[in-house]
């Protein structure tokens, strides 16, 4: 009886103990994780950082939750945040990793907190949580928290800081960023983490203490090709005058001002970062270095033209006075009107001089004289009126330029007939009242008229040059006159 009562009470005690609430705290983690006493949760171990030469054969080490991967250095890693089907809380732990596969470690029956991570050998290329392509590796992150409830769902659990119990009695992460329980500043961005959160600065800012300060990108060259302008949270590039930003907003390229907005009045030449203007012949750049001004060549020199310089836009021209024409662009040459057009009558002859022409009678003979040949008049011996007159008068004409240099030989007189036993003498009979001329005998039968004073025209001089012929025995005496008309032109050319 007593034995039966004891067994009954023991059974009730055991049944009652099954419904007693317990508080279970886990401080052990699965392989690949370690306990964080501050955050009160398991955190991943970075094997790539602590394991010397974790990967061999030129492979690179890639840390992963609960383990690491050895992948080719050229591999591209793509993180896939897709949530796979979560394991049941009572899953049994598998054995260690094998070469060529990835071994997943799950919760053990002893109550050790699983990490959901994995480890891979140097030749690992596939596994339950890794998908690979030819050179791409897609890693599936296990979103399950590194804590799970015991296999008995009737037990209460105590979650670490940053976690809360879900309706399924699972410790799930608290998203402080969406719940508004974070303490990030208004100029910061809240980033949720497993069991916690972090505050990050906006792009272009960096943390200094608890504050976000602007990053001066311009102090870290070479962001910009030429000029860098820092702005709050960013920067932009500027180019020097004559350059413009390229499509990459970094490089400065030269602006061809001659093609874009040609400001030159005449000729434009592009140079690196600028341009220069040039003018056509006959023009010069004005003070603004853009426009062209005409050069007044006539003011720069008085020797450009023989007579008169006329300035024109971009050039100049030379003019000559009436009776002259321009030759070789600058000099003046007399027009021989007697060979072209003149107004002389039929009984007149045309005589051209420098700058004009004159008409003289074809028969210039005076009274008592008879025209015997062209321009030669003879007074007959039979005429008693001729005894006191020169036997003959020859008419000659010449033209000289104004302001001719002196002394200068200008005309030679010579006897046309030579008599035996005679002596010839020469003199200026008339037309030299001011002493402009001098007659120098050069031989017994010739003399030279010399200009000794400069003459200015236009002017006409008529000079009678007389030759006296005397017989050496005194039986013969005669004279003849050369009437020379000298026309002085109006100019020195």
Curated annotation (Swiss-Prot):
Annotated GO biological process: camera-type eye development; embryonic eye morphogenesis; epidermal growth factor receptor signaling pathway; negative regulation of chondrocyte differentiation; peptidyl-tyrosine phosphorylation; post-embryonic eye morphogenesis; regulation of DNA-templated transcription
* GO terms assigned for molecular function: calcium ion binding; epidermal growth factor receptor activity; epidermal growth factor receptor binding; growth factor activity
- Gene behind the chain: Efemp1
Tissue-specific expression: Expressed in the eye in the ciliary body, cornea, inner nuclear layer of the retina, and in the optic disk.
What residue range is the signal peptide?
Answer: 1-17
Function comment: Binds EGFR, the EGF receptor, inducing EGFR autophosphorylation and the activation of downstream signaling pathways. May play a role in cell adhesion and migration. May function as a negative regulator of chondrocyte differentiation. In the olfactory epithelium, it may regulate glial cell migration, differentiation and the ability of glial cells to support neuronal neurite outgrowth.
Primary location class: secreted
Q: What is this protein called?
A: EGF-containing fibulin-like extracellular matrix protein 1
User: Any idea which UniProt keywords this protein has?
Assistant: Calcium, Disulfide bond, EGF-like domain, Extracellular matrix, Glycoprotein, Growth factor, Repeat, Secreted, Signal
Task: Using the record's annotation, list all stretches that form the EGF-like domain.
Answer: 26-71, 173-213, 214-253, 254-293, 294-333, 334-378
The record's note on quaternary structure and interaction partners says:
Interacts with ECM1. Interacts with TIMP3.
């Amino acid at each position: 009886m007593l034995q039966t009562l004891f067994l009954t009470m023991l059974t009730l005690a055991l049944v009652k103990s099954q419904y007693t609430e317990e508080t279970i705290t886990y401080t052990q983690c699965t392989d690949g994780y370690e306990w964080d006493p501050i955050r009160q949760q398991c955190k991943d171990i970075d094997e790539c950082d602590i394991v010397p030469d974790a990967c061999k054969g030129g492979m690179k080490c890639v840390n992963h939750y609960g383990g690491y991967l050895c992948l080719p250095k050229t591999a591209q890693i793509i993180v896939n945040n897709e949530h796979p089907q979560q394991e049941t809380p009572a899953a049994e732990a598998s054995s260690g990793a094998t070469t060529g596969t990835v071994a997943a470690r799950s919760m053990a029956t002893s109550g050790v907190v699983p990490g959901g991570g994995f480890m891979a050998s140097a030749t690992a290329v596939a596994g339950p949580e890794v998908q690979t392509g030819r050179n791409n590796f897609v890693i599936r992150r296990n979103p399950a928290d590194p804590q799970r409830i015991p296999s008995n769902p009737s037990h209460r659990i105590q979650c670490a800081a940053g976690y809360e119990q879900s309706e399924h009695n699972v410790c799930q992460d608290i998203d402080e960023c969406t719940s508004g329980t974070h303490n990030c500043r208004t100029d910061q961005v809240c980033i949720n983490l497993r069991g916690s959160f972090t505050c990050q600065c906006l792009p272009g800012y960096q943390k200094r203490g608890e504050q976000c300060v602007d990053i001066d990108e311009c102090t870290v060259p070479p962001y910009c090709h030429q000029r860098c302008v820092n702005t709050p949270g960013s920067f932009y590039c500027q180019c020097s005058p004559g350059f413009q930003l390229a499509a990459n907003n970094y490089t400065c390229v030269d602006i061809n001002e001659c093609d874009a907005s040609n400001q030159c009045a005449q000729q434009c030449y592009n140079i690196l970062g600028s341009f220069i203007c040039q003018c056509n012949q006959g023009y010069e750049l004005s003070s603004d270095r853009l426009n062209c001004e005409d050069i007044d060549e006539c003011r720069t020199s008085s020797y450009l033209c023989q007579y008169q310089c006329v300035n024109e836009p971009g050039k100049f021209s030379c003019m000559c006075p009436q009776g002259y024409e321009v030759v070789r662009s600058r000099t003046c040459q007399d027009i021989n009107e007697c060979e072209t057009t003149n107004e002389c009558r039929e009984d007149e002859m045309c005589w051209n001089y420098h700058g004009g022409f004159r008409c003289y009678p074809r028969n210039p003979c005076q009274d008592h004289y008879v025209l015997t040949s062209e321009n030669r008049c003879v007074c007959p011996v039979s005429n008693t009126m001729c005894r006191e007159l020169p036997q003959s008068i020859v008419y000659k004409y010449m033209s000289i330029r104004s302001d001719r240099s002196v002394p200068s030989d200008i005309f030679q007189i010579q006897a046309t007939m030579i008599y035996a036993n005679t002596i010839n003498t020469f003199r200026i009979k008339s037309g030299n009242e001011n002493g402009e001329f001098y007659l120098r005998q050069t031989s017994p039968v010739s003399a030279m008229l010399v200009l000794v004073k400069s003459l200015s025209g236009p002017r006409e001089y008529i000079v009678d040059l007389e030759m006296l012929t005397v017989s050496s025995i005194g039986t013969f005496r005669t004279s003849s006159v050369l009437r020379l008309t000298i026309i002085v032109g109006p100019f020195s050319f």
